[in-house]
Amino acid sequence: VHGSRGLGDVYKRQGDFIHALMESIHDELDKEIDPMSREGISQYSLRGNLDAAVRVSNACLADQHVIDALSVRLMKPLEDETGWDVFSLEYKLRAPLTTIFSDREMGRYSRAFTFLWKLKRAEYTLCELWKAMKPTVSSRFQREGLGGNIGKALEVEQARCHRVRQSMHALISDVQYYVMFEVLEPSWNEFECKLSHNAANDDLDSIIAGHENYLNSVIEKALLGTKSQVLQRSLQLIFDSVQKFKSHTFKLYEAIEDASRVRKSDQRRIVEREMNQQWGVDFGESKEGEDYLSEDFVTGAKESLDSIENEFQKHVDGFLKLLPLQTHVDTSFLSFRLEATFRQGA
């Protein structure tokens, strides 16, 4: 039963294990994998990163037998998949726990972990984007960066990036809150309460049945059951939009920073020439910094963000339409929060 509790303990917000793990393995998981040879990602390196994440996080306070049972598993990759798509944590069980945790149950735990992992990856991605986009970075670009019409257009695109990131973060946070506080914790508390009340009279069969009911509750309420497959695909499209936004934003900010760096170098040369009584501005240089990024680049960046923003909103609209149809579970509070966030301006 302690293995079941680990699902929530590892995932809960106040824990730092998942964040420490993602910090240490994101470079490895960004690599593409050959579907035939599985080359491109090292399970040995991932295992070392897992051990390091345990040591530097609150996971080190867990019982030693729990830490020893935690391992890394790589699922079979498909075409164009990266390490993020095949990585999974594995809890290796020994008898007599295997009596309760059969291969079927462990497969369902794996499905739940994969979903939670995708949620946490989306949250981690959006937090990393905030570090790249935070106001101090934007103000530095404005102070040292590009002038003229191109500079103004880039400021508009930076502001739009902040708005899109905020919308994505709001949705991911609401879904995480639902999974944590309306699915995992109440399902576990109910299971634990039944075990403690019937501890003296329960036989093995009743424990197995209680655990199966608990797992059924988690799978269904987390929208991972057969009745929620369409909704789950809709949520996966939202996850994909987050990763597309990450790629777009990092490319945009890297280009702006590179242009800013070149401009600063040119500005130093201009000052040196003027001090030596030479022409300050040479061919291809601009004191306003208008020529370091082309209008085509700015137009392309705007069109790319338009596409990502429209795609994300389309997927959110689809998700909101499907959510009330999940009559087998109570998603009313999640629907209310999302409607308040995404429909108030409609």
Give the location of each predicted region:
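Single conserved hydrophobic/aromatic residue that forms the stacking wall/gate
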Residues: 2-7, 11
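Extended amphipathic alpha-helical scaffold segments
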Residues: 9, 100-129, 155-203
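Charge-rich, solvent-exposed alpha-helical interaction surfaces
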Residues: 20-24, 28, 32, 49, ...
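Extended amphipathic alpha-helical elements
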Residues: 54, 74-78, 88, 95-107, ...
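Intrinsically disordered, proline- and charge-rich regulatory regions
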Residues: 112, 169, 176-178, 199-346
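Amphipathic alpha-helical scaffolding segments
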Residues: 130-141, 184-192, 236-237, 256-271
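Long, K/E/R/D-enriched contiguous segments that form extended
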Residues: 137-152, 157
